[in-house]
């Protein structure tokens, strides 16, 4: 629960799930502007589509909603420079991270494969030059996030 998580965990989430993206984009954006081309594709999160936000994902989902808004704003700033900005919103996908989602991993047949996300990425990169898919939501037909609560045990290094 939010009230029991150490503040340091929130800071870590901010650096990983928001500021890391912004810093990386800042490293490349001026060269893209100079070249008048490029594509910025951010893996945001399908959790931005959840209402209500699943328990234990409040801070994470809030940061991802912020990242999605940042990407939309960046699209409007960069489109006249020939730079595309796309947010991919993947649902629960079979990765090492999903091993920490207790309820979700009980039935792995409900999880998407990384191939589905790869296909979304390919789509974003192969649309015509005058088209930019602003957001691509890739959600499993029976995604576990339709459930209102997903128990999540976050591992803390050194604890």
Q: Where do the PLM segments sit?
A:
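Residue(s) in the substrate-gating loop at a strand-loop-helix junction
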Residues: 45
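Hydrophobic positions on the long internal alpha-helix
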Residues: 24-28, 70-71
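Active-site-adjacent segment of SDR/Rossmann-fold oxidoreductases
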Residues: 50, 73-83
């Amino acid at each position: 629960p939010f009230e029991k998580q150490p503040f340091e965990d929130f800071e870590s989430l901010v650096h990983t799930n928001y500021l890391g993206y912004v810093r990386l984009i800042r490293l490349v954006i001026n060269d893209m502007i100079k070249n008048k081309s490029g594509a910025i594709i951010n893996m945001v999160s399908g959790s931005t589509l959840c209402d209500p936000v699943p328990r234990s994902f409040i801070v994470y989902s809030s940061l991802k909603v912020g990242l999605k808004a940042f990407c939309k704003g960046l699209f409007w700033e960069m489109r006249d420079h020939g730079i595309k900005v796309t947010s991919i919103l993947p649902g629960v996908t079979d990765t090492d991270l999903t091993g920490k989602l207790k309820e979700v991993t009980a039935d792995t047949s409900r999880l998407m494969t990384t191939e589905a996300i790869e296909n979304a990425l390919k789509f974003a990169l192969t649309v015509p030059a005058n088209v930019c898919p602003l957001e691509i939501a890739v959600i499993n037909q029976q995604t576990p996030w339709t459930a209102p609560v997903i128990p999540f045990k976050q591992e803390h290094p050194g604890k």
